[in-house]
Amino acid sequence: MRKWTVPSVLFLLCPSLSSSCQGRKIHANAEADSDAPVDPPKVEDKIGAVPNGLSTDSDVAKREAESMSMRNLRSDAEKFEFQAEVSRLMDIIINSLYSNKDIFLRELISNASDALDKIRFLALTDKEILGEGDTAKLEIQIKLDKEKKILSIRDRGIGMTKEDLIKNLGTIAKSGTSAFVEKMQTSGDLNLIGQFGVGFYSVYLVPDYVEVISKHNDDKQYIWESKADGAFAISEDVWNEPLGRGTEIRLHLRDEAQEYLDEFKLKELVKRYSEFINFPIYLWASKEVEVEVPAEEDDSSDDEDNKSESSSSEEGEEEETEKEEDEKKPKTKKVKETTYEWELLNDMKAIWLRNPKDVTDDEYTKFYHSLAKDFSEEKPLAWSHFTAEGDVEFKAFTLLPPKAPQDLYESYYNSNKSNLKLYVRRVFISDEFDELLPKYLNFLKGLVDSDTLPLNVSREMLQQHSSLKTIKKKLIRKALDMIRKIADEDPDEANDKDKKEVEESTDNDEKKGQYAKFWNEFGKSIKLGIIEDAANRNRLAKLLRFESTKSEGKLTSLDQYISRMKSGQKDIFYITGTSKEQLEKSPFLERLTKKNYEVILFTDPVDEYLMQYLMDYEDKKFQNVSKEGLKIGKDSKDKELKESFKELTKWWKGALASENVDDVKISNRLANTPCVVVTSKYGWSSNMERIMQSQTLSDASKQAYMRGKRVLEINPRHPIIKELRERVVKDAEDESVKQTARLMYQTALMESGFMLNDPKEFASSIYDSVKSSLKISPDATVEEEDDTEEAEAESGTTESSAAEDAGAETLDLKDEL
């Protein structure tokens, strides 16, 4: 007989299932039949009701009630002792302080599903094995009894023989149990349950007494019971109604586990963990309805007796007529009553198991709203539905929401929460990890369903699982392809030469502007991906969008930029700043714009970090136009100008020695501005300096190191620069000329986006310049205030305060009297 792992122990195997490939066959057939209609149980049906053709003992109910009330092992049952390791295991589980006890229901439903899978597989070759009537219904039922504090889970699966009950509920492979106990003692994490084949023992998280009633087609009905005290008992079941076939588990809940007698709690757990189980899950749920009941005589309306005697005779006649008609009608009233009926909890089908070609857009949209708990009417921007085959087989379904959550980036690096849910054989495992998708794609909603990952896999084991890297790699590729497809189908994203052709071939206006919508919501995530994911950096770069000096207020891509590059242009030009308006006025763009070069405008703070990682694209380097190294063609007069201003540049560098200026050079980027300050190629730009200085925990020493060298570039064609050269040639020691040179440098710093180290000094220089232009003597001083008037004012204030204090004291005295 094949050994099955204990997560499916409850509803165990059949001796005929010996082939190693049967498990896969079971699931394959389960998928094929998953949409088969199943009639819900009737309202009057009971868990464990007698199937057609079977009789019941008249004293069954009495003996059953006595057994439940005692919560003791039956005296005539055959008793067994658990293995030593199992006893230790249950002690750890029961006494653990770990809060997630909810997994017990997931385990039991998963086991029930396994049992139903097995009986359905056997029925493929022998239809009679299913039986008739209710016994043939492949479903799971959950029922609770608040008075007796019992939670019952029932299935009509394969059931267990007496031997199965002993073998699978009382023993575990010693090596697996020992390893599990050791792991539990060190980590205390109950999510490890099931990884070592001990899933059934999670039931001891909530009850102090467990009954497992099971009927296999090849054996009598037996009852397995345990109080988790190191022993269990098995006896032929003569206390309960015949099951027909299948298993029912009754959990006699401890006082501290009464929350699991709440219908809402059970519905929530089923929705969370077992929503896509292959079989219908029903809950015996209460429901308030209004019903009409006969009204008592005292409740009958006697409004006619209280009518005012002043009523008109006509009104009286009408009332008499109405009264006669009312007397003819049966007297009833509406009251609220609590009724019970079987409520289907998992009506949402696992559409990822179907062929994508067979799923409609409306079905995808409906599934998105259910999965994402999005109650708006907006459709997802896109979705990706695929099956991966090969060494690792899994099905995946990812969706792109229409809007980003408000807190998407608030805890970007600190949260383990993922919007991608992991399922194993349609059983929800976890969303408390980020190993299946990188953080920058965490805005995607969806799920992964794998048959190769172990059930109840923990975050720690998931990180080490050999299949994980393969799954992650395929998910990333499919996600980026999905996003790329939005751009490819958007007419606004076509190159200028292809736009007309795309617009003519596109008859779906819904796709127009979709990528701009995506970028406005999730563009920052793509930039973070370029920073974090070196392997997919080029793919992500194709998804970048930005404004430029030629984009006319619209977003453009790197491919579109390259298609518009001038002949002979080797670099991709860009500049960073706080806003588009500020950058368009930047002196760094003057000559580039004049020569019709396109410059990318980066205005997001993350763009500074982005460009530290995105060094090139399609064999073209990126060049920050506010840094050294800008090449935009040579001027025939460059050498002549450089020689002509050699004396000025040398003098100016010396005059700015205290400002830590590395050099003064002739500029090739200025047209109308006299001078600008640029930084070294690998140093921080002015925008980056401002960002880093705003950081709460910034390191001053690192800032000084990363600031880079500053170079003053002058415009040799500007009249101010020409005049300054003449002044220097005439008298290089003129203090006013030196002051003018320093003032121009400080002004250039501000215009280039830098922050001044000493704003007060700069302001004083400006005021001195204003004095000079107004022909005010440099020795002129500010008129001093008259101290006498100030002293008299202070004296008057003191006397007034004293008078007010005296008046206040008088009032206080009057109040006391």
Curated annotation (Swiss-Prot):
Residues 31-58, 293-333, 777-817 are annotated as: Disordered. Residues 1-20 form the signal peptide. ATP binds at residues 111, 155, 168, 200. It is found in: Endoplasmic reticulum lumen. SUPFAM superfamilies: ATPase domain of HSP90 chaperone/DNA topoisomerase II/histidine kinase, HSP90 C-terminal domain, Ribosomal protein S5 domain 2-like. InterPro entries: HATPase_C_sf, Heat_shock_protein_90_CS, HSP90_C, Hsp90_fam, Hsp90_N, Ribosomal_Su5_D2-typ_SF. A motif (Prevents secretion from ER) lies at residues 814-817. One of its GO terms (cellular component) is endoplasmic reticulum lumen. NCBIfam families: PRK05218.1 (NF003555). PANTHER family: HEAT SHOCK PROTEIN 90 FAMILY MEMBER. This is Endoplasmin homolog.
